[in-house]
């Protein structure tokens, strides 16, 4: 009698079947043509133009910030060119009452959420006023510890739910951040309590210089949502419409009490990781850069709007000049901001200083008065 064949669980097939379901969602192709009519968001012509204006303005801000950094007039700076659709189209899907918990590359989102540009410059300089956001700007200071913002976002979203607020908390990290323990802890907590959170992974292919292929065996980062039981979606991060629609749907789910969503945006940063000495030519090829430049989010969205008769060179030049004027005024205001002192730092840290610090405070106060 022939032996009975032993059945197998075939866990590999289950994995492959699961990973194959995460296909990148796209609405606009590289030439600005609509390839998925059913998913085109319900945005007015005025809103489409406004989103483009923000993207152009932010590209100029990035160029000027790099220049200001090289002049020694800005401190820490993480370039954003290439990621405008991923950053700004997602922010555009938010409401004023929503909270943004940014990473250090995500300053543009909080600027468009209400943070004055001057304060963004002061944050870069390490001035304490750059961390004192005005009342009504629902955002935390950019998180420097990679991935830590995911835990904070879970907490903020949970608080919004407990308080009965019709709002969400959204956060951003890069592909490298999704390899951090805080990433999993944050999405797991938010999932367990159905907190109104949106978790965005801006997959720009490199964690500083480490390619995504050396960070994880997962075919997509969106599929990491499955482990905690929440929806995950991968979208073309160079496609403003796709990013907007994915974020809008995630927000609708969240405020309806259906819990968080994980969004992976496939994007690319054209510049270095930060201006602190990173040289991308050591780990990226010029051919790779050229391929991604063909997918430029501004070029793509510009073509889309031009085809609709909503955009032209004159309009773009107006935005560019306005951006330059805004930046010039903001950096001048930052230059004229009173320099921080030891006593000013102590004053904002304590309402009632311990005796030993109060004594030190008086010593520094006397020194600073001379």
UniProtKB/Swiss-Prot annotation:
It holds the Pfam family E1_dh. It is an enzyme of class 1 (oxidoreductase). SUPFAM superfamilies: Thiamin diphosphate-binding fold (THDP-binding). It comes from the Bacteria. One of its GO terms (molecular function) is pyruvate dehydrogenase (acetyl-transferring) activity. GO terms for biological process: branched-chain amino acid catabolic process. It catalyses: N(6)-[(R)-lipoyl]-L-lysyl-[protein] + pyruvate + H(+) = N(6)-[(R)-S(8)-acetyldihydrolipoyl]-L-lysyl-[protein] + CO2. Its EC number is 1.2.4.1. Its cofactor is thiamine diphosphate. InterPro entries: Alpha-ketoacid_DH_E1_comp, DH_E1, PdhA/BkdA, THDP-binding. Keywords: Oxidoreductase, Pyruvate, Thiamine pyrophosphate. Heterodimer of an alpha and a beta chain. The pyruvate dehydrogenase complex catalyzes the overall conversion of pyruvate to acetyl-CoA and CO(2). It contains multiple copies of three enzymatic components: pyruvate dehydrogenase (E1), dihydrolipoamide acetyltransferase (E2) and lipoamide dehydrogenase (E3). This is Pyruvate dehydrogenase E1 component subunit alpha. It comes from Staphylococcus aureus (strain MRSA252). The gene is pdhA.
């Amino acid at each position: 009698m022939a032996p009975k064949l032993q059945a197998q669980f075939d866990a590999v097939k289950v994995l492959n079947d699961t990973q194959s379901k995460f296909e990148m969602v796209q609405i606009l192709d590289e030439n600005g043509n609509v390839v998925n009519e059913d998913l085109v968001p319900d945005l007015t012509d005025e809103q489409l133009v406004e989103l483009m204006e923000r993207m152009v303005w932010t590209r100029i801000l990035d160029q000027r910030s790099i220049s200001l950094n090289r002049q020694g007039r800005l401190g820490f700076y993480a370039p954003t060119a290439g990621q405008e659709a991923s950053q700004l189209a997602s922010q555009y899907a938010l409401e004023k009452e929503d909270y943004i918990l940014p990473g250090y590359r995500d300053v543009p989102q909080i600027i468009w959420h209400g943070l004055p540009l001057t304060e963004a410059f002061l944050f870069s300089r390490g001035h304490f006023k750059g961390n004192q956001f005005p009342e009504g700007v629902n955002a935390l200071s950019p998180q420097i510890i990679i991935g830590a913002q995911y835990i904070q976002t879970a907490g903020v979203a949970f608080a919004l739910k407990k308080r009965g607020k019709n709002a969400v908390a959204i956060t951003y990290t890069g592909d490298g951040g999704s390899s951090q323990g805080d990433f999993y802890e944050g999405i797991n907590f938010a999932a367990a309590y159905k907190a109104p959170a949106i978790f965005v992974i801006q997959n720009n292919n490199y964690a500083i210089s480490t390619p995504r292929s050396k960070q994880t065996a997962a075919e997509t980062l969106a599929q990491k949502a499955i482990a905690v039981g929440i929806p995950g979606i991968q979208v073309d991060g160079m496609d403003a419409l796709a990013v907007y629609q994915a974020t809008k749907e995630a927000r609708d789910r969240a405020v309806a009490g259906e819990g968080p969503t994980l969004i992976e945006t496939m994007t690319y940063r054209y510049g270095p990781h930060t201006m602190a000495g990173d040289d991308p030519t050591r780990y990226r090829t010029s051919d790779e850069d050229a391929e991604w430049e063909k997918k430029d989010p501004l070029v793509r969205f510009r073509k889309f709007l031009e085809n609709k008769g909503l955009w032209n060179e004159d309009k773009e030049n107006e935005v560019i000049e306005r951006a330059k004027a805004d930046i010039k005024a903001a950096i001048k205001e930052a230059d004229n901001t009173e320099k921080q002192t030891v006593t000013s730092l102590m004053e904002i840290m304590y309402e009632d200083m311990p005796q030993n610090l109060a004594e030190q405070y008086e010593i520094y106060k006397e020194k600073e008065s001379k």
